[in-house]
Structure formats: structure tokens, C-alpha cells
Amino acid sequence: MEQHPIKINKVQIRNLQIEDYAQLSQSFTRVYSDGSDVFWTHKQIQKLINIFPEGQIVTVVDDKIVGCALSIIVDYDKVKNDHTYAQVTGKETFNTHNPEGNILYGIEVFI
């Protein structure tokens, strides 16, 4: 199969802003194309931006969001090695985020 180069004019890595949500949700839909509605809500993204803006990153190619990395900081003493995703994210409420914690926990990454 012959591959054709794709022209890219601009690649940007920056902090996620709530104004990005429409594009971000479109990316979620493409990434999770199995028909499930397992993606972050506007309210959840807003909370992540409010509590830890520097931990929410997007990759933008030619003004289009093509990836993201979402994270929180947690205290390892409260999480330990045998945690579940629900436990470490506070069942996706992010009430486990602790700015004084000692672990950066990635809760979503895709490109």
C-alpha cells in the first residue's frame, strides 16, 4: 500500500482549556469508536481544569485537537499498589487530587 505524506503546518502542545471541549469530545468519539459513550463530560473536564490546569494537556495539529493527556496528583500512601482506577480517581470525581501528593497519575492519554 502506497503512503502519501500528510502536510502539517503547525504542531502545538498546550494546556487544555474548557473552550476546547467540543473538539475534545469529537476526538473521544473517534478514539472510542466502539460505540460506547465512555468519555469525559464537560463537567469532569471543567473540574480537572479547575483543580489542576497544568496537568491537562492537548496536542493540536493545524488547529485541530488530535490527542490529550489528563492527570491528577495523588498521595501514594493513600493509593498503594493494589488500587483500582475508581479508587484513585474517586469514581471519576477527582476528589482524590492532592496538590501536595507525590504521584502524577495519568487518567487519560490518547493520540
Where are the predicted features?
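Short amphipathic alpha-helix that is part of the acyltransferase structural core
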Residues: 1-79
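Conserved acyl-donor/pantetheine-binding loop and adjacent beta-alpha core of acyl/acetyltransferases
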Residues: 69-110
